[in-house]
């Protein structure tokens, strides 16, 4: 990775400098400051009017006895990186310095990246091709994992984003299993982070974890939501008109403050894509998320007495693949009947990517009374920009405890799948919610969940050979490093 040219930064990005300043100046304790450690050449590359870097303890590494720092305040001279870290660990620095940042140059960064004391790496990822003559090695992803990645921005014609990686294993040895195989991971059950608490991150970075969008929304609903009755008789607290946005470029938004049933998310989405409305197909795979709405008792209670148990009616998959076809039962052959919205979406993305009508809708008013449950996540629009595919989904009714973690993952997964089919990269998933509600019976469980600190989101790997939306099977998908907190039980309101 290039970091310099002719002893200076090879790009002019005010946003990059602001990010650097914000992350190295900001402290949680206002009585403390951070230390920035740099080599002599890095110090000399800073314009005279800006050095020493204000609001920080400047630690300069040099073996030159003739080095003159003009008796500047907030400047300390050390002969090596080790001696600098030892000094900062002693009084008075250990009492006044909150965090230590290694900021350059190239050789010092190369020493630091794999050092056991390196807890996190914060970098600006430049996506444009820019000539450099100073480099650092790539991030070792066997030890570090993305925590936060900003949405890409373009400044002075240069596309870039800000990324923070956290150490999740203590050493290279611990990033391997007993057989020596690297745990960068197909089997997420085997991968446990050696580091469990990530509060060592700067507060501004720690709180940018995208899971906080969900946690903060749940907290806001519980504290400030309107108390309402609902069709299940359970009662809710709710808010109207909410939005969350997730970045799909580096990791996958599967919540970590509780274990989300990933296999259920995956199998349900493949079931939707197949056009099936038979809940027994999922039951046979050990997926019981639709059992409550497919039972004999429930179908009878909503007047579908003639409907076979397990037959959900013309729900999501049917509308995606056969919109407008006459629904009879879950056993009928609907091939070639109705309008295949999913294939239409894919065709438009491939052949008319600027179309503003790339829509997938499960809301069909003429079929609502035939459905075991009218669509909650009902409308998705896709958007193509600079080789990336983004999706915005509208959800009329959102069960924040049980449904929303599933919905975030499901539509993020759908976006990633369609992107691959269309030779694009995943961009954003935007989740827009009408009635965002917490069932009163879920409040205690959600309060437990809100006490948990997020862990890094996993990374999703999809079999790159698959280019047909109907060809995907469960073995085509692998989660890398999903290590959530334990499962939190919540009972579904039916």
Curated annotation (Swiss-Prot):
PROSITE patterns for the chain: DHFR_1, DHFR_2, THYMIDYLATE_SYNTHASE
Record field: transmembrane: none
One GO MF term attached to the UniProt entry: thymidylate synthase activity
This protein's pathway: Cofactor biosynthesis; tetrahydrofolate biosynthesis; 5,6,7,8-tetrahydrofolate from 7,8-dihydrofolate: step 1/1
Residues engaged in binding NADP(+): 2-8, 40-42, 61-64, 104-111
Keyword Transit peptide included in the entry's annotation: no
Residues noted as binding substrate in the record, renumbered to the chain: 16, 103, 124
Keyword Oxidoreductase included in the entry's annotation: yes
Catalyzed reactions: (6S)-5,6,7,8-tetrahydrofolate + NADP(+) = 7,8-dihydrofolate + NADPH + H(+); dUMP + (6R)-5,10-methylene-5,6,7,8-tetrahydrofolate = 7,8-dihydrofolate + dTMP
Short name of any one Pfam family annotated for the protein: DHFR_1
Protein name (Swiss-Prot/TrEMBL): Putative bifunctional dihydrofolate reductase-thymidylate synthase
Higher taxonomy: Eukaryota, Viridiplantae, Streptophyta, Embryophyta, Tracheophyta
